[in-house]
Amino acid sequence: MIVFLKDLFNNPLLYENKKIFLKGWIRNCRFQKKLFFIDFNDGTFINDLQIVCKKDKNFFLEKIKKKLQIGASIEIEGFLVKNFKINDIFELEAEKINILGSSSFEYLIQPKNHSKAFLRKIPHLRLRTKIFGSVFRIRSAVFLAIHEFFKNEDFLLTNTPIITVNDGEGAGDLFQITTLNLEKLVLTKDKKIDYLKDFFGRKTFLSVTGQLELEALATSFNKVYSLGPIFRADNSNTIKHVAEFWMLEVEMAFSNLEKNMEIIERMLKKVVKSCLLTNQNDLKFLDENESPGLIKKLNEFIGLKSFPKIKYKEAMDILIKSGVDFEFKPFHGSDFYTEHEKYLTEVHFKSPVFIIDWPKEIKAFYMKINPDKKTVACVDLLVPFVGELVGGSQREENLEILKNRMKELNISSENLEWYLDLRRFGSCVHSGFGLGFERLLIYLTGVENIRDVIAFPLSSKSINF
């Protein structure tokens, strides 16, 4: 029977002294006079299985030895036995090896430590390393844990358009898409591009958020969420930014900002706890090889009674009075930079922290204006090591206030009349949030660079797939 390493390592006694079949790849080969060894992995588990090949007992194994190369895919038949030196370690005594796909000395993933900078140049092969194997098994588990949480909370899973005419965030970092022939553009009489000739008959873009559409869904189905790709033409060349990433977006009818924060905290603790249970071996490897103290940090996260919550003004006062010589001097009315987020989460609070009631001038048009007329009912969740993980708000449900806010910011209602309809017909208090999926993975894995938690990362001047 075909056995996966995950099942074998989790319950080796079930397979002891039994003939089994394995399919996977060679991680390493070691040759001795009377026997040779293969470090074998099939991608389902962090640990390799040692394959023992006794040449004096099997002429076939001696013959195939010359064809064995690191990276080759193989099929193995043999018996699982205990290592004669270390009683609690199992290995496979091979009877037959079949090479399914050959490799060569040119294979770039050799059994040594490779820098992440080197591995980023070969994303199609780096997935075969232990660190990236761990990261992407955890990525899969987090996806499933998120869906499980919202299923149990009776949320409707939905999808929002990837192609749009709106800039939901108002940042302007949009990828424009077109079917027009850029070599032979059709111009109008006043020398402008004639978008009537384009596929949709108007300018269109890749979506930067599905929030606006989710609000329509929430006012129909009460509680909704989506988990999908987001695109931003952001030239920031930092360890936190890429052009394509995944976003968890949630909208809830009849929910205020407090309910928003409650669901954020409960969801995150549930996901982290689930990951600690289902990915113990991968997290142990990352703790020992990538981010010392990772497991302790995650256990402390789920052990917190509740995340601290402060107003923007209080957070800014903490920074101003800290006595720290920040590169970017904090002042009331400014946004937080990475160094400010690090101070608040890693020095002052030493924990995640909710920051609420931000100045309306630095937040989006759809956020509910507070009674003071100066701030909006929004929240950012900052966490150690990552910074901003979640951004959310109570949405403005009053039609006239929303229209006035759009006028203040010179936002045309031409493409947003449908959004205003949500306030015209059956408006209600509602709130929601967005969570950067890859930023959550950075926190969970201890891997610093967002490009290392996405299989095929895209950034400015960098696209190969």
From Swiss-Prot:
GO CC field: cytoplasm
Catalytic reaction(s) noted: tRNA(Asn) + L-asparagine + ATP = L-asparaginyl-tRNA(Asn) + AMP + diphosphate + H(+)
EC nos: 6.1.1.22
Location relative to the cell: Cytoplasm
PROSITE patterns: AA_TRNA_LIGASE_II (PS50862)
Keyword terms of this UniProt record: Aminoacyl-tRNA synthetase, ATP-binding, Cytoplasm, Ligase, Nucleotide-binding, Protein biosynthesis
Xref: NCBIfam families: asnS, PRK03932.1
Subunit structure: Homodimer.
Protein name (record): Asparagine--tRNA ligase
Protein's organism: Phytoplasma mali (strain AT)
